[in-house]
Protein backbone atom coordinates (compact mmCIF):
# COMPACT_ATOMS: atom_id res chain seq x y z
CA UNK A 1 0.00 0.00 0.00
CA UNK A 2 2.90 2.37 0.76
CA UNK A 3 4.48 1.65 -2.62
CA UNK A 4 1.44 1.48 -4.93
CA UNK A 5 -0.78 4.04 -3.18
CA UNK A 6 1.31 6.32 -0.96
CA UNK A 7 3.95 6.87 -3.65
CA UNK A 8 2.56 5.55 -6.93
CA UNK A 9 -0.73 7.35 -6.58
CA UNK A 10 -0.09 10.37 -4.36
CA UNK A 11 3.44 11.49 -5.32
CA UNK A 12 1.83 13.78 -7.90
CA UNK A 13 0.39 16.13 -5.26
CA UNK A 14 3.63 17.55 -3.76
CA UNK A 15 5.28 17.70 -7.19
CA UNK A 16 2.33 19.36 -8.94
CA UNK A 17 3.34 23.04 -8.39
CA UNK A 18 6.85 22.39 -9.71
CA UNK A 19 5.45 20.52 -12.71
CA UNK A 20 2.99 23.33 -13.43
CA UNK A 21 5.86 25.84 -13.35
CA UNK A 22 8.36 23.70 -15.30
CA UNK A 23 5.94 22.64 -18.04
CA UNK A 24 3.88 25.86 -18.06
CA UNK A 25 0.62 24.01 -17.40
CA UNK A 26 -2.71 25.50 -16.37
CA UNK A 27 -4.60 24.03 -13.41
CA UNK A 28 -7.01 22.50 -15.93
CA UNK A 29 -4.10 20.67 -17.58
CA UNK A 30 -2.79 19.53 -14.20
CA UNK A 31 -6.28 18.35 -13.29
CA UNK A 32 -6.57 16.42 -16.55
CA UNK A 33 -3.33 14.58 -15.77
CA UNK A 34 -4.65 13.66 -12.33
CA UNK A 35 -7.85 12.44 -13.98
CA UNK A 36 -5.82 10.24 -16.35
CA UNK A 37 -4.43 8.46 -13.30
CA UNK A 38 -7.92 8.03 -11.91
CA UNK A 39 -9.25 6.73 -15.24
CA UNK A 40 -6.56 4.07 -14.97
CA UNK A 41 -7.70 3.44 -11.42
CA UNK A 42 -11.25 2.95 -12.72
CA UNK A 43 -10.09 0.49 -15.38
CA UNK A 44 -8.12 -1.41 -12.76
CA UNK A 45 -11.13 -1.52 -10.47
CA UNK A 46 -13.32 -2.90 -13.27
CA UNK A 47 -10.81 -5.65 -14.04
CA UNK A 48 -9.96 -6.41 -10.42
CA UNK A 49 -12.84 -8.84 -9.63
CA UNK A 50 -11.47 -11.27 -12.22
CA UNK A 51 -8.06 -11.02 -10.55
CA UNK A 52 -9.39 -11.78 -7.08
CA UNK A 53 -11.05 -14.93 -8.45
CA UNK A 54 -8.00 -16.01 -10.45
CA UNK A 55 -5.69 -18.83 -9.31
CA UNK A 56 -2.83 -16.55 -10.39
CA UNK A 57 -3.67 -13.78 -7.92
CA UNK A 58 -0.11 -13.80 -6.49
CA UNK A 59 1.35 -13.25 -9.95
CA UNK A 60 -1.10 -10.43 -10.64
CA UNK A 61 -0.23 -8.75 -7.36
CA UNK A 62 3.51 -9.03 -8.03
CA UNK A 63 3.04 -7.63 -11.55
CA UNK A 64 0.96 -4.74 -10.17
CA UNK A 65 3.63 -3.83 -7.63
CA UNK A 66 6.34 -3.89 -10.31
CA UNK A 67 4.20 -1.82 -12.68
CA UNK A 68 3.57 0.76 -9.98
CA UNK A 69 7.29 1.18 -9.29
CA UNK A 70 8.12 1.26 -13.02
CA UNK A 71 5.51 3.89 -13.89
CA UNK A 72 6.66 6.05 -10.99
CA UNK A 73 10.23 5.93 -12.30
CA UNK A 74 9.02 6.68 -15.85
CA UNK A 75 7.94 10.09 -14.57
CA UNK A 76 11.62 10.97 -14.87
CA UNK A 77 11.59 10.13 -18.59
CA UNK A 78 8.25 11.65 -19.63
CA UNK A 79 8.99 14.48 -22.07
CA UNK A 80 5.53 15.18 -23.47
CA UNK A 81 2.05 15.60 -22.05
CA UNK A 82 0.77 12.58 -23.99
CA UNK A 83 3.50 10.42 -22.46
CA UNK A 84 2.60 11.78 -19.03
CA UNK A 85 -1.03 10.79 -19.64
CA UNK A 86 0.02 7.23 -20.52
CA UNK A 87 2.36 6.90 -17.53
CA UNK A 88 -0.18 8.17 -15.01
CA UNK A 89 -2.96 6.05 -16.55
CA UNK A 90 -0.90 2.86 -16.17
CA UNK A 91 0.05 3.86 -12.64
CA UNK A 92 -3.65 4.14 -11.82
CA UNK A 93 -4.37 0.65 -13.18
CA UNK A 94 -1.56 -0.82 -11.07
CA UNK A 95 -2.64 0.92 -7.86
CA UNK A 96 -6.25 -0.26 -8.26
CA UNK A 97 -5.12 -3.84 -8.80
CA UNK A 98 -3.04 -3.68 -5.63
CA UNK A 99 -5.79 -2.09 -3.53
CA UNK A 100 -8.58 -4.45 -4.55
CA UNK A 101 -6.43 -7.60 -4.53
CA UNK A 102 -4.91 -6.94 -1.11
CA UNK A 103 -8.09 -5.60 0.51
CA UNK A 104 -10.39 -8.33 -0.79
CA UNK A 105 -7.98 -11.11 0.10
CA UNK A 106 -7.30 -9.66 3.54
CA UNK A 107 -11.01 -9.28 4.30
CA UNK A 108 -11.67 -12.85 3.17
CA UNK A 109 -8.85 -14.32 5.27
CA UNK A 110 -9.67 -12.28 8.38
CA UNK A 111 -13.37 -13.14 8.14
CA UNK A 112 -12.42 -16.81 7.89
CA UNK A 113 -10.22 -16.44 11.01
CA UNK A 114 -12.81 -14.24 12.78
CA UNK A 115 -10.27 -11.42 13.05
CA UNK A 116 -12.21 -8.73 11.17
CA UNK A 117 -11.03 -6.02 13.58
CA UNK A 118 -7.67 -6.04 11.78
CA UNK A 119 -9.25 -5.51 8.37
CA UNK A 120 -8.25 -1.86 8.04
CA UNK A 121 -4.67 -2.00 9.31
CA UNK A 122 -3.09 -2.10 5.86
CA UNK A 123 -4.55 1.31 4.93
CA UNK A 124 -2.04 2.95 7.27
CA UNK A 125 0.55 2.01 4.66
CA UNK A 126 -0.80 4.76 2.41
CA UNK A 127 0.10 7.40 4.99
CA UNK A 128 3.51 5.79 5.48
CA UNK A 129 4.07 5.97 1.73
CA UNK A 130 3.13 9.66 1.70
CA UNK A 131 5.72 10.36 4.41
CA UNK A 132 8.41 8.39 2.57
CA UNK A 133 7.45 10.26 -0.59
CA UNK A 134 7.98 13.59 1.17
CA UNK A 135 11.45 12.55 2.35
CA UNK A 136 12.35 11.97 -1.29
CA UNK A 137 10.86 15.28 -2.41
CA UNK A 138 12.77 17.20 0.26
CA UNK A 139 15.96 15.76 -1.26
CA UNK A 140 15.75 18.44 -3.93
CA UNK A 141 16.53 18.36 -7.63
CA UNK A 142 14.39 19.04 -10.66
CA UNK A 143 11.13 17.27 -11.39
CA UNK A 144 12.80 14.42 -13.31
CA UNK A 145 15.30 13.79 -10.51
CA UNK A 146 12.53 13.65 -7.93
CA UNK A 147 10.44 11.20 -9.96
CA UNK A 148 13.50 8.96 -10.46
CA UNK A 149 14.19 9.02 -6.73
CA UNK A 150 10.56 8.17 -5.99
CA UNK A 151 10.66 5.31 -8.48
CA UNK A 152 13.70 3.85 -6.73
CA UNK A 153 12.00 4.17 -3.34
CA UNK A 154 8.85 2.55 -4.68
CA UNK A 155 10.90 -0.37 -6.01
CA UNK A 156 12.57 -0.75 -2.62
CA UNK A 157 9.23 -0.83 -0.84
CA UNK A 158 7.95 -3.32 -3.40
CA UNK A 159 10.87 -5.63 -2.63
CA UNK A 160 10.26 -5.37 1.12
CA UNK A 161 6.54 -6.01 0.64
CA UNK A 162 7.14 -9.09 -1.45
CA UNK A 163 9.69 -10.40 1.03
CA UNK A 164 7.04 -10.12 3.75
CA UNK A 165 4.05 -11.49 1.86
CA UNK A 166 5.53 -13.38 -1.09
CA UNK A 167 5.49 -16.73 0.71
CA UNK A 168 1.91 -16.22 1.86
CA UNK A 169 -0.58 -18.43 0.07
CA UNK A 170 -3.04 -16.18 -1.76
CA UNK A 171 -6.24 -18.09 -2.40
CA UNK A 172 -8.67 -16.96 -5.12
CA UNK A 173 -11.87 -15.58 -3.64
CA UNK A 174 -14.61 -18.16 -4.23
CA UNK A 175 -17.43 -17.28 -6.58
CA UNK A 176 -20.80 -17.49 -4.85
CA UNK A 177 -24.03 -18.58 -6.47
CA UNK A 178 -26.52 -16.15 -7.96
CA UNK A 179 -29.08 -17.29 -5.38
CA UNK A 180 -26.65 -16.42 -2.59
CA UNK A 181 -26.01 -13.01 -4.11
CA UNK A 182 -29.68 -12.17 -4.57
CA UNK A 183 -30.66 -13.24 -1.07
CA UNK A 184 -28.14 -10.85 0.45
CA UNK A 185 -29.24 -7.75 -1.48
CA UNK A 186 -30.54 -4.59 0.12
CA UNK A 187 -30.25 -0.87 -0.52
CA UNK A 188 -27.65 -0.28 2.19
CA UNK A 189 -24.87 -1.36 -0.16
CA UNK A 190 -26.08 0.81 -3.03
CA UNK A 191 -26.35 3.90 -0.84
CA UNK A 192 -22.81 3.20 0.34
CA UNK A 193 -21.64 2.88 -3.26
CA UNK A 194 -23.24 6.18 -4.35
CA UNK A 195 -21.92 7.99 -1.29
CA UNK A 196 -18.46 6.57 -1.93
CA UNK A 197 -18.58 8.07 -5.41
CA UNK A 198 -19.39 11.48 -3.90
CA UNK A 199 -16.48 10.96 -1.51
CA UNK A 200 -14.18 10.34 -4.50
CA UNK A 201 -14.94 13.83 -5.82
CA UNK A 202 -15.08 15.39 -2.37
CA UNK A 203 -11.65 14.39 -1.12
CA UNK A 204 -9.71 14.63 -4.37
CA UNK A 205 -9.99 18.40 -4.85
CA UNK A 206 -7.89 19.09 -1.77
CA UNK A 207 -5.82 15.91 -2.16
CA UNK A 208 -4.74 17.03 -5.64
CA UNK A 209 -4.35 20.78 -5.20
CA UNK A 210 -3.57 21.38 -1.51
CA UNK A 211 0.11 22.15 -2.18
CA UNK A 212 -0.95 24.52 -4.96
CA UNK A 213 -3.33 26.15 -2.46
CA UNK A 214 -0.45 26.61 -0.03
CA UNK A 215 1.70 28.12 -2.76
CA UNK A 216 -0.83 30.93 -3.17
CA UNK A 217 -0.50 32.00 0.47
CA UNK A 218 2.01 34.56 1.70
CA UNK A 219 4.37 32.19 3.50
CA UNK A 220 7.95 33.51 3.16
CA UNK A 221 10.58 31.02 4.23
CA UNK A 222 8.09 28.12 4.41
CA UNK A 223 8.32 25.06 2.18
CA UNK A 224 4.70 24.82 1.06
CA UNK A 225 5.09 21.11 0.38
CA UNK A 226 5.11 20.63 4.15
CA UNK A 227 1.30 20.70 4.08
CA UNK A 228 1.37 17.30 2.36
CA UNK A 229 3.68 16.01 5.07
CA UNK A 230 1.02 17.00 7.60
CA UNK A 231 -1.54 15.03 5.59
CA UNK A 232 0.69 11.95 5.80
CA UNK A 233 1.33 12.40 9.53
CA UNK A 234 -2.40 12.66 10.21
CA UNK A 235 -3.16 9.74 7.90
CA UNK A 236 -1.07 7.03 9.61
CA UNK A 237 -2.83 6.94 13.02
CA UNK A 238 -6.25 7.94 11.67
CA UNK A 239 -7.23 4.45 10.51
CA UNK A 240 -6.69 3.07 14.02
CA UNK A 241 -8.37 6.01 15.77
CA UNK A 242 -11.50 5.91 13.59
CA UNK A 243 -11.69 2.13 13.96
CA UNK A 244 -11.65 2.64 17.74
CA UNK A 245 -14.57 5.07 17.35
CA UNK A 246 -16.40 2.60 15.09
CA UNK A 247 -16.03 -0.18 17.64
CA UNK A 248 -17.82 1.97 20.21
CA UNK A 249 -20.40 3.91 18.22
CA UNK A 250 -21.06 1.70 15.21
CA UNK A 251 -19.57 1.52 11.74
CA UNK A 252 -22.19 3.55 9.87
CA UNK A 253 -22.41 6.24 12.55
CA UNK A 254 -18.64 6.62 12.41
CA UNK A 255 -18.56 6.71 8.62
CA UNK A 256 -21.20 9.45 8.61
CA UNK A 257 -19.21 11.51 11.13
CA UNK A 258 -15.98 11.07 9.16
CA UNK A 259 -17.66 12.35 5.98
CA UNK A 260 -18.80 15.48 7.84
CA UNK A 261 -15.40 16.11 9.43
CA UNK A 262 -13.75 15.83 6.03
CA UNK A 263 -16.28 18.27 4.57
CA UNK A 264 -15.14 20.83 7.16
CA UNK A 265 -11.50 20.21 6.26
CA UNK A 266 -12.15 20.57 2.52
CA UNK A 267 -13.99 23.88 2.98
CA UNK A 268 -11.24 25.16 5.27
CA UNK A 269 -8.59 24.26 2.69
CA UNK A 270 -10.40 26.24 0.02
CA UNK A 271 -11.19 29.38 2.02
CA UNK A 272 -8.24 29.61 4.41
CA UNK A 273 -6.12 32.72 4.00
CA UNK A 274 -3.48 31.62 6.49
CA UNK A 275 -0.90 28.87 6.61
CA UNK A 276 -2.09 27.82 10.06
CA UNK A 277 -5.64 27.42 8.76
CA UNK A 278 -4.42 25.32 5.85
CA UNK A 279 -2.40 23.11 8.21
CA UNK A 280 -5.55 22.48 10.24
CA UNK A 281 -7.37 21.61 7.02
CA UNK A 282 -4.60 19.13 6.21
CA UNK A 283 -4.97 17.50 9.63
CA UNK A 284 -8.70 17.06 8.97
CA UNK A 285 -8.09 15.82 5.43
CA UNK A 286 -5.31 13.40 6.31
CA UNK A 287 -7.16 12.34 9.43
CA UNK A 288 -10.25 11.26 7.49
CA UNK A 289 -9.74 10.26 3.87
CA UNK A 290 -7.80 7.09 4.59
CA UNK A 291 -10.17 6.19 7.40
CA UNK A 292 -13.21 6.78 5.17
CA UNK A 293 -11.66 4.53 2.54
CA UNK A 294 -11.24 1.78 5.12
CA UNK A 295 -14.57 2.30 6.90
CA UNK A 296 -16.47 2.49 3.63
CA UNK A 297 -15.04 -0.78 2.35
CA UNK A 298 -15.68 -2.45 5.71
CA UNK A 299 -19.29 -1.25 5.66
CA UNK A 300 -19.72 -2.58 2.11
CA UNK A 301 -18.26 -5.95 3.10
CA UNK A 302 -20.62 -6.15 6.07
CA UNK A 303 -23.61 -5.15 3.94
CA UNK A 304 -22.78 -7.82 1.34
CA UNK A 305 -20.99 -10.68 3.14
CA UNK A 306 -21.75 -13.15 0.34
CA UNK A 307 -20.12 -11.05 -2.38
CA UNK A 308 -17.14 -9.30 -0.89
CA UNK A 309 -15.26 -9.02 -4.20
CA UNK A 310 -18.29 -7.42 -5.88
CA UNK A 311 -18.81 -4.99 -3.00
CA UNK A 312 -15.17 -3.89 -2.83
CA UNK A 313 -14.78 -3.51 -6.60
CA UNK A 314 -18.13 -1.66 -6.94
CA UNK A 315 -17.14 0.77 -4.21
CA UNK A 316 -13.78 1.26 -5.91
CA UNK A 317 -15.44 1.90 -9.28
CA UNK A 318 -17.79 4.51 -7.80
CA UNK A 319 -14.89 6.13 -5.96
CA UNK A 320 -12.87 6.14 -9.21
CA UNK A 321 -15.65 7.88 -11.13
CA UNK A 322 -15.86 10.60 -8.50
CA UNK A 323 -12.14 11.19 -8.27
CA UNK A 324 -11.53 11.21 -12.04
CA UNK A 325 -14.19 13.91 -12.49
CA UNK A 326 -13.01 15.95 -9.50
CA UNK A 327 -9.59 17.19 -10.69
CA UNK A 328 -10.79 18.01 -14.21
CA UNK A 329 -13.76 20.02 -12.91
CA UNK A 330 -11.97 21.71 -10.01
CA UNK A 331 -8.94 22.61 -12.14
CA UNK A 332 -11.16 24.44 -14.60
CA UNK A 333 -13.08 26.12 -11.79
CA UNK A 334 -9.77 27.32 -10.32
CA UNK A 335 -8.60 28.67 -13.68
CA UNK A 336 -11.90 30.52 -14.13
CA UNK A 337 -12.14 31.99 -10.61
CA UNK A 338 -8.48 32.36 -9.70
CA UNK A 339 -8.85 30.33 -6.50
CA UNK A 340 -10.17 27.03 -5.15
CA UNK A 341 -13.08 28.37 -3.08
CA UNK A 342 -15.96 27.30 -5.31
CA UNK A 343 -14.38 23.94 -6.12
CA UNK A 344 -13.89 23.25 -2.41
CA UNK A 345 -17.47 24.24 -1.59
CA UNK A 346 -18.77 21.88 -4.28
CA UNK A 347 -16.60 19.08 -2.89
CA UNK A 348 -17.90 19.73 0.63
CA UNK A 349 -21.53 19.63 -0.54
CA UNK A 350 -20.92 16.19 -2.05
CA UNK A 351 -19.30 14.97 1.18
CA UNK A 352 -22.33 16.13 3.16
CA UNK A 353 -24.55 14.33 0.64
CA UNK A 354 -22.45 11.19 1.14
CA UNK A 355 -23.04 11.46 4.89
CA UNK A 356 -26.78 11.76 4.25
CA UNK A 357 -26.75 8.51 2.27
CA UNK A 358 -25.29 6.54 5.19
CA UNK A 359 -28.44 4.95 6.59
CA UNK A 360 -29.05 1.37 7.75
CA UNK A 361 -31.17 -0.88 5.57
CA UNK A 362 -32.60 -4.32 6.26
CA UNK A 363 -29.03 -5.57 6.79
CA UNK A 364 -28.02 -2.68 9.00
CA UNK A 365 -24.35 -2.04 9.50
CA UNK A 366 -24.38 -0.25 12.82
Question: PLM ranges: what are they?
Answer:
Residues 24, 77-83, 250, 272-273:
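Helix-breaking motifs and short loop linkers at transmembrane-helix boundaries and internal kinks
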Residues 147-163, 342-359:
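Symmetry-related core transmembrane helices of the 12-TM Major Facilitator Superfamily/SLC fold
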Residues 303-339, 347:
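A late C-terminal transmembrane helix in Major Facilitator Superfamily
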Residues 87-125:
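Cytoplasmic helix-loop-helix junction between adjacent transmembrane helices
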Residues 81-83, 112-166:
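Helix-loop-helix hairpin linking two adjacent transmembrane segments in secondary transporters
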Residues 249-296:
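C-terminal transmembrane helical hairpin of 12-TM major facilitator-type secondary transporters
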Residues 44-57, 238-251, 334-335:
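Helix-to-loop junctions at the C-terminal end of transmembrane segments
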Residues 13, 189-229, 235-237:
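Extracytoplasmic gate region of multi-pass secondary transporters
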